[in-house]
Structures are given as C-alpha cells and as structure tokens.
C-alpha cells in the first residue's frame, strides 16, 4: 500500500506493549492509534503522544478495593465482562468523567469523548488527509465511531450485525481475508468496481444457506 503513495494507519483498542507482542511490524504503518483512541504512536521515531488525560488514580484505587481485575495503559483502563456493572457504578459514585466502550467481551474505560474516531481524526490531521478519503475496516462494537469517521466504512463478514448495517461495504471473506479483498480492489481501481449492494447480497445469500 505505501509504495502506491497511500497512507496506512492502524487503529486499535490494544495497548502498545500488547500490540507489539502479537504484531512486530508496526513500521509498516505511517501512524498507529492505540488504546482505543487514547494514544498516537509514530513508528518512524518511536514517539508516543497521549491524546487524553491519564486514568484518575481515585478510579484505579476504587477498582482495586472492589477486586476488579484490570490492566492500565497510558489513557485506557481495561477489564472484561461481567465486571461492567461494577465499573459503571464506580464511575457514578466517584463522579469522574469517564465512559465505557465494549469490544467483544472487553470493557474499556476512557475519558469521555475519547474513542477510535477521535484518535483517527488526530492521525489524519497530522498526515494532512481528509476523512472523506479514508477507507476503514472494522468488526466490533468499538468500531462504530471509527467507521463513522471514514469516508468509506467496511465491515468484514464476521463483523457484528449492527456494524454491517451501517457499513458502506460488507466483505465476502472474514477477518484479514476480508480486508485483503477490499485492498486488492482499492489498488486496482480505487474501488470503482466495488458494488456495496453486491457484497451485502452475498452475505444475505450466505446466511440463507446456513
């Protein structure tokens, strides 16, 4: 993609150390938005920029008191279902300005207004790219704000139904194969021959056969 002159931005809910454990080629990207929009990472220089306030210590202390298992990034606090009710009550009781985002069983806590979409906007501003020129891929709850920011929103075949309903394109293939499916068309003719209705129909036919 980069030899074609296009920019590559990875937008993820993972913390950078966790991301590096599962994927060690972040240098392939111009920028990385990590922690669900809280952190901007520049692979060329290794520089990290926090895009929000760090988690309040009072909130972390309350989670420890309540024996909630969690991990902490520079801007994100993450735990898992079924702890969301305890987390929401802690936020309410403390009166801290935090919100909860779900991601396939993960429960992510961030400052209000911070999400993948706001992180992408920060990356695009740095790159000088309009959101109208962005093709984004998603599959989970935390991708709603992200895909809403993209000019062309793509949901892979294994994405949640609610995400598919709002996507411009739904791929035939799942996971990375679905991403590759669209990228091939993008490199070939900038998606000129990519008919969203055709791909949605393919998904409907696949469901009928099951």
List the predicted regions and their residue ranges.
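Structured loop/turn residues at secondary-structure junctions
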Residues: 11-14, 82, 112, 139, ...
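Mg2+-dependent phosphoryl-transfer enzymes with acidic/Ser/Thr/Gly-rich catalytic loops
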Residues: 117-210
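Short active-site oxyanion
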Residues: 5-9, 28-30, 47, 75-76, ...
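Active-site neighborhood of HAD-like aspartate-dependent phosphohydrolases
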Residues: 1-24
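Anion (oxyanion) recognition and catalysis
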Residues: 2-3, 64, 92, 148, ...
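HAD-like small-molecule phosphatases
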Residues: 16-125, 195, 199-210
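Generic beta-sheet signal
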Residues: 11, 35, 101-103, 137, ...
